[in-house]
Regions:
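Intrinsically disordered, low-complexity terminal regions
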Residues: 1-202
Length: 202
């Protein structure tokens, strides 16, 4: 939880340092959509970044990159490149589309939408829903991984050998159990957060 709060604080700092900022909720059309609030609900189109920070976040906005940090996060818009999300519960809705990679760190992650490249997830629980479409791989560090029998995962599913896994035999994908290097069963969130920190520094 401390690591998640640290990443959330960095998101907020970056938002404060960028000049084109919108402190409100509603529909927007701008180079960047950037919102800090307790409750965030956005629609519209950004020609650049979508950066949202709050307690409860609902993003139906479209943009090039998504940077989202909150407690409850729901994404139903279209991200044309990569999405970086930190939260307690993160849901990619059925209408949500990530056209490149999804990086997510949360206690619970639910994917019902489309990811057109890879998913990098660090979470206590990951659910790939019945409407999910993942064109690339799933790289997971999680205690529990569930893939619905009607989900589409075209790449490789990678998880720790200690993970509690439910993957239907009919799923057309490769499944790889990665050997655990340490002896703890704690979820390691360092890898995904490292990716988030790296992008923010750049």
């Amino acid at each position: 939880m401390k690591n998640i709060k640290r990443v959330l604080a960095i998101f907020c700092l970056v938002i404060l340092l960028i000049p084109t900022v919108i402190f409100a909720t509603g529909s927007y059309s701008s180079d960047n959509i950037m919102v800090i609030d307790e409750t965030v609900a956005v629609n519209g189109t950004a020609n650049g970044l979508i950066m949202l920070c709050g307690n409860t976040i609902s993003s139906n906005a479209n943009g090039d990159y998504g940077f989202i940090a909150g407690r409850e996060v729901n994404v139903s818009g279209n991200i044309t490149r990569d999405a970086f999300i930190v939260g307690e519960t993160v849901t990619i809705e059925q209408t949500g589309v990530i056209n490149r990679d999804l990086y997510v760190c949360a206690s619970k992650v639910i994917i019902n939408g489309a990811v057109n490249r890879n998913v990098y997830v660090a979470s206590s629980e990951v659910l790939v829903g019945d409407k999910a479409y993942i064109r690339g791989d799933i790289h997971s560090t999680t205690n529990k991984l569930v893939i619905n029998e009607t989900a589409n995962v075209l790449g490789t599913v990678e998880y720790k050998s200690t993970t509690n896994v439910s993957i239907p035999e009919g799923i057309k994908t490769n499944v790889i159990a990665v050997e655990v290097k340490d002896k703890t069963n704690k979820t390691n969130t360092i890898d995904v957060q490292g990716e988030l920190f790296g992008l923010l520094i750049i």
